Swiss-Prot record:
Residues that bind GTP: D75, V76, R77, S78
Key word Thylakoid present: no
Protein name, entry field: Nucleotide-binding protein MAB_2783c
SUPFAM superfamilies hit by this protein: P-loop containing nucleoside triphosphate hydrolases
């Protein structure tokens, strides 16, 4: 069950940098949360000493700095953890910054199961039982949980659901952004190792057998026109575009942010290049996609 109580930053918060302090119970998902925030464009510092957090913020406020969103993962194993957190909040307040505190928790049963699956001991366990270590940490962090801006219970949240919760709270985009690479290649040189989807366009006539087209690549207007004007080319592009829209929606739901579509022909010079350019052009108008074109095997012949 996801428990969310979010309070916006105060009116005194500095608009030049947004700061989130990520904490919570060990095993509740701090590491996963850090990765999600990184994917959202946040600069993430894991277990940065408290005395360096304000210095990091000062760097973010400096002219020309690219740090506009800073997330700091704070670990209960730090000495004087509770006091450290309050000290950081007070120091940032003097700079006109009101950081948000994200607290991650889970049920004792869920935490025990996760630790047993990973065969790890709890940081506060010592010579005690795992359950006692969890109870000690829960008591230690009770005051921080009470004052947190956002509390997420990850007991029954799979990773995609946790990612979605983090995105709702901390993404500046209403729809998750996905980076798409459309890559042409030649089958005779092997499949791209990083391809998520592979499509074979050797069903189209090969410009290699047209003397005036052979020297050119699929980027040349005459070759592109030849390939795209073949029977079935338009229908293929339209159908495959609609298929990709379904897949992209699924990627968003599963929290995937990168996709590589490999388009292959025999040598990676004519048909795959022309189709790659056309397919990328059809995806480019989607503001929620970042489309990149790569022609792996151009120049190899």
């Amino acid at each position: 069950m996801e428990s969310m109580t979010l309070h916006p930053p105060s009116e005194t918060a500095n608009a030049d940098i947004d700061v989130v302090l990520v904490t919570g119970l060990s095993g509740a998902g701090r590491g996963t949360t850090a990765k999600v925030l990184e994917d959202l464009g946040w600069y993430v510092a894991d277990n940065l000493p408290p005395e360096l957090i304000t210095r990091m913020v000062d760097l973010g406020l400096a002219a020309g700095s690219r740090i506009t969103q800073l997330a700091v993962v704070m670990d209960v194993r730090s000495r004087g953890f509770t006091g450290d957190l309050e000290s950081v909040r007070a120091d940032l307040a003097t700079r006109g910054i009101s950081p948000r505190v994200l607290f991650l928790e889970a049920s004792d049963e869920s935490l025990v199961r996760r630790y047993e699956n990973n065969r790890r001991s709890h940081p506060l366990q010592g010579g005690q039982t795992l359950a006692e270590g969890i109870a000690a940490e829960r008591a230690l962090l009770s005051s921080i949980r009470a004052s947190a801006d956002l509390v997420i219970d990850t007991s029954s949240l799979p990773v995609p659901a946790l990612r979605a919760a983090i995105e709702r709270a901390f993404s500046s985009e209403s729809v998750a952004h996905i980076s798409v690479t459309v890559e042409s290649f030649g089958f005779k040189y092997g499949l791209p190792m990083d391809a998520d989807m592979v499509v074979d366009v050797r069903f189209l006539p090969n410009p290699h057998w047209v003397d005036e087209l052979r020297p050119h690549t699929g980027q040349h207007p005459s070759v592109s026109h030849y390939v795209l004007s073949q029977p079935g080319a338009d229908e293929f592009l339209d159908t495959y575009h609609r298929l990709l829209n379904l897949v992209i929606d699924g990627y968003r739901r599963e929290g995937k942010r990168y996709m590589t579509i490999a388009v292959g022909c025999t040598g990676g010079k004519h048909r795959s290049v022309a189709i790659t350019e056309a397919l990328a052009a059809s995806l480019a108008p989607d503001d929620d996609l970042s489309v990149r074109v790569l022609h792996r095997d151009l120049g190899r012949e």
